Every structure is written in structure tokens, then in C-alpha cells.
Amino acid sequence: MKKVVHIGLPKLSEDELIEVGEIAQKVIINYIFDHLAKSEVRDMEVTARINQGETLDLELEVYVEVPIFVKVDVESLIDEAIDRAYEVVEEYLRKLAKGKGNEGREEAEEPLEEPEEG
């Protein structure tokens, strides 16, 4: 399964680009293992590719192999994990764009809930 999302941002440093890829990979791996036991996963590969030109392109590719007896829709699980990774990366990039800098990966990996106004 592969998805590409185009994100418009000012130019990021090499360290920030690496951080984006690492965050996406960590979110995907954690999501998969939140839904499957490690013993249920025979093989897993998570690849993040980032291309920065006029736009910032993040391509995530995920492969998960489980034994036949594991009753899970692997494609749906991968889709959900990728969607979650894009949400977390988007939040991280918004923080960077607002000038908050690298407030820590842990904050970027928390659930995305904005405080209610009013």
C-alpha cells in the first residue's frame, strides 16, 4: 500500500526532513502493534520517502505479512496506520510552520486534539 500527500511548506532542513520520516515510520509501527501482537507479524517493512521541491512530498509504503490464521484485514489496517501517520506528520509540520520548532517528537505523536475555544 502506498500513498502520497503533497504538503506546501517553506523549505525544511535536512534534520527536519529526517524527523518527518522517522515520525511517520514510528506512528505506523506503533499503530500496527497496537492492533496486532508482535508474534502475529511475520514480516513488516515501512519506508518513508521525502522529496522537497516546489512542494514537500511524503510517500509512505508499508508491507505487513501475517500468518493465515490471523483474522485481520491487513490492507485496512495498513490504510488506517498510514492515515494516522499523515495526521501526526501534518500536526508536526504545522508546529514547525508556526515557528514552535522541534518541541519534541513525543508531542507530535500525541493524539491530535485542538483545545475548544469559548
From Swiss-Prot:
Transmembrane segments: none annotated. Pfam families: DUF3194. Residues 106-118 have a biased composition (Acidic residues). InterPro entries: DUF3194, MTH677-like_sf. It comes from the Archaea. Residues 98-118 are annotated as: Disordered. Belongs to the UPF0440 family. This is Uncharacterized protein PYRAB15120. The lineage of its organism: Archaea, Methanobacteriati, Methanobacteriota, Thermococci, Thermococcales.
